Amino acid sequence: MNRLMILVFAAVILALASADDVDIAKRGVPCLCVSDGPRPRGNNLSGTIWMKTGGYGGNGCPKGWHFCGKSRGLLSDCCKQ
């Protein structure tokens, strides 16, 4: 069970977008922004999950991005460019 949790966590970390990537809008783990409204079928997720790191400040979003989620996560935030 512990190995499975480590593998899942590693997969999430590797799937997250990097702020230096050229195709940043096409990569990362999607999340629900407030502007997306309620989530009926067919509604798109327009945000991207960013892990909170020291370089991004308190909101967890990189430069040029803003927080768009309903609530802040412990280790990550939903951000939109």
UniProtKB/Swiss-Prot annotation:
Keyword Cell inner membrane: no
InterPro entries in UniProt: Myo_ane_neurotoxin_sf (IPR023355)
One of the Pfam families matching this protein, by short name: Toxin_4
Span of the signal peptide: 1-19
Protein's UniProt keywords contain Phosphoprotein: no
Disulfide-bonded cysteines: C31-C78, C33-C68, C61-C79
Main localization, broad class: secreted
Residue ranges annotated as propeptide in the record: 20-25
Gene3D superfamilies (alphabetical): Anthopleurin-A
UniProt entry keywords in alphabetical sequence: Cleavage on pair of basic residues, Disulfide bond, Ion channel impairing toxin, Nematocyst, Neurotoxin, Secreted, Signal, Toxin, Voltage-gated sodium channel impairing toxin
Molecular function GO labels: sodium channel regulator activity; toxin activity
Subcellular location(s) of the protein: Secreted; Nematocyst
GO terms for cellular component: extracellular region; nematocyst
The family this protein is said to belong to: Belongs to the sea anemone sodium channel inhibitory toxin family. Type I subfamily.
Functional summary from the UniProt entry: Binds specifically to voltage-gated sodium channels (Nav), thereby delaying their inactivation during signal transduction. Causes death to crabs.
Protein name, as recorded: Delta-actitoxin-Aeq2d
Species assigned in the record: Actinia equina (Beadlet anemone)
